[in-house]
Amino acid sequence: MTAQQIDASGRLRHLLTLEGLPRETLLQLLDRAGQIRDAAVGRVGNKRQVLAGSAVCTLFFEPSTRTRSSFQLAAQRLGADVLNFDASTSSTRKGETACDTLRNLEAMGVRGFVVRHPDDGAVAALADAAGEGTALINAGDGRSSHPTQGLLDMLTLRQAKGPDFSKLKVVIVGDVKHSRVARTDLHALRTLGVGEIRVCGPQSLLPDDETLKGCVVGDDFDAMLEGVDALMMLRLQRERMEEGLVPSLEQYHAQYGLTNERLARAGKDAAVLHPGPINRGVEVTDEVADGPQSWVLRQVANGVAVRMAVLETLLG
């Protein structure tokens, strides 16, 4: 897939996954996003119109609030016209394929597509169908990938702990098995050379494939917290209870919920991240989510800068 998203000259053509993305490319995107964030580019009265005259479509086949809004703001701040595609009211309900939808929008002059889809590999398939000069960005597909979330998580981690990841200990907590965010963050952390990756959750929610290769894996949250520099808490999807993978929300919180008492076991000033939406009282308590070690809202803010950097790189 990497060859598909990078052209023969080494230029990023699409952003489909962070798996296999060269470290240099990853760092360039993070550096540019950091510049945008630090300069507060994109605020009212300080717009960079590098995409003026370009059209970007958010093509979402799954619900989204943060990701869609963040991409829309990013594109608008770069001067692009933004078309929001709603699958529930589109011709896809009449049987039109996603590829035909893409081609019709291309014919209208849309150059960039931000796509979210419930199926693994769906965005890559659309990239295969796209014409020359069209760029696709994966805004989350199935369980496999969510590259801009991974980028904003890494940007937030750099902001919290500095650019050198080699001595950092990071723990990812929760439903790793069904999480595209966890898979994406694992690829990014490995590429950036993080010192130690720990993964913690109920055995029923941990993958049994190569996903966790090289990680320290365990189901004892209190033990896995010792000395960590950052915690990436994952959303517990309520359907996992219906599938019998989690006995109850109360029991999950008792074993894997982050409280101030538990956070005290982590390293000094450990950063708490969460991709959202947060189930308060399940993954984290109110005190942690709103506390001084929470970087959750800074993740959201960094998301706009990251998506501006990606759009600028692909379409600018």
Curated annotation (Swiss-Prot):
Signal peptide: none annotated. One of its GO terms (molecular function) is aspartate carbamoyltransferase activity. The gene is pyrB. One of its GO terms (cellular component) is cytosol. L-aspartate binds at K94, R180, R235. It comes from Stenotrophomonas maltophilia (strain K279a). Heterododecamer (2C3:3R2) of six catalytic PyrB chains organized as two trimers (C3), and six regulatory PyrI chains organized as three dimers (R2). It catalyses: carbamoyl phosphate + L-aspartate = N-carbamoyl-L-aspartate + phosphate + H(+). The keyword Transferase applies. This is Aspartate carbamoyltransferase catalytic subunit. Pfam families: OTCace, OTCace_N. Belongs to the aspartate/ornithine carbamoyltransferase superfamily. ATCase family. Catalyzes the condensation of carbamoyl phosphate and aspartate to form carbamoyl aspartate and inorganic phosphate, the committed step in the de novo pyrimidine nucleotide biosynthesis pathway. Pathway: Pyrimidine metabolism; UMP biosynthesis via de novo pathway; (S)-dihydroorotate from bicarbonate: step 2/3.
